[in-house]
Amino acid sequence: MKLLATVGLALCALGATTWSQAQAQAKLCDKPRQMDGFKTCADVEKAEAEGAFVLYSTDPEPGQAKLVGAFNKAFPKIKTTYFRLQAGALYAKILSERQAKSFLVDVIQISDMGMILDFQKKGGFTQYISPEMAAFKPEYKSKPEGYWTWGSVIMAGIAYNNKVTPEAEAPKTWEDLLNPKWIDAINVKVSNSGLQHGVWFMLKPLLGEDYFKKFATQKPRAFDSYVQQYGRLVDGQDKVIMGAQYSGAIEFTAKGAPIGFVFPDKGLPAVSETYGIVDGGPHPHAAQLFMDWFLSPVGQKALAEALALHSPRDDVPPPPGAVPLSKMKLLIPADWEAFEKDRPSFAKEWDRIVGARR
């Protein structure tokens, strides 16, 4: 399989007219400081004096705790805090906080590029060009550079319990999920999920407008987190996950769970988990230091170990036990503005499909 992704063609044009010429001309510091495994332009002493760092993220709490714990291990003087919600709810939270002039978070990660672009347009990010950004492809970074950067690539396939469903009987294609035998046996994510939106956005053109109308008759149940989804699969409450997050399968399989994962031939919808420093955050120096650490091979490996997520960096290996990006057929939106505009209609239709079945 080949990596199939014409990523972010619209990104080059986005944001350039939004920001002043002075902002666009921001550059890397003259003499980045060499740390243990990464370079930084942050004032490390000031970051440690701030003594704290706050991350908002869509990732499950146990993985977040491991990730910020690894940062805290590298910088023990900086106490780390995290908060987790699905993308839509998390974005609503930070917008509400900013409207109330309550600046509580230093770095935010959202798994929905439409929300990231909207936040950039609203001036929600502060520009900081990390020395580690040079290792990321242009399409994985904001224009101008320094407002946000892809921290990981997440992809969705089909998962099943291989103790309940033999491999020969498991669905092999997206169309197989329409088989009546899967009625009342499928779970998905709620409409607040950036990845679920990506599944919808990329599969509709491939499978036709009627696909999701037919899928609705399967009576899928929606859940907030892949932890819930895979937990129900392991317990036998559901038989299949449609749009199953691959990192969740890797995580549960590593724990000995009987999970089978299918890579449909037509491809795996994929989106990014994107990180940026929030403008007006309470610990700006710690935020810069975190971004430098996180975007480096050291931080990216910590992410892979904590959450089984794939790094966009070519020099970072995939999570243990995972297929590398180069071996996947990824379906990544090429027009993120269209993706952003599609969200309201997706949310309305997806909520109708799942109804109250949660």
Regions found by a protein language model. Give the residues of each.
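Immediate post-signal peptide segment of exported/extracytoplasmic ligand-binding proteins
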Residues: Q21-V54, N72-K73, L178-D184
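Extracytoplasmic ligand-binding site segments that recognize negatively charged/polar headgroups
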Residues: V54-G69, T80-L95, F103-Q237
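Paired acidic/hydrophobic, glycine-rich loop segments that form the ligand-binding mouth/hinge
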Residues: K101-Q109, K239-Q245, G260-F261
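A ligand-binding cleft/hinge motif common to bilobed small-molecule-binding domains
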Residues: G114-D118, K239-P258, L307
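Periplasmic-binding protein-like
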Residues: P138, V153-I154, W182-N192, K213-A216, A222-F223, F294-P317, ...
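A bilobed periplasmic-binding-protein/Venus flytrap-type ligand-binding module shared by bacterial periplasmic
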Residues: A159-V164, F201-M202, V271-H283, F294, ...
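Extracellular/periplasmic bilobal clamshell ligand-binding domains
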Residues: P320-R358
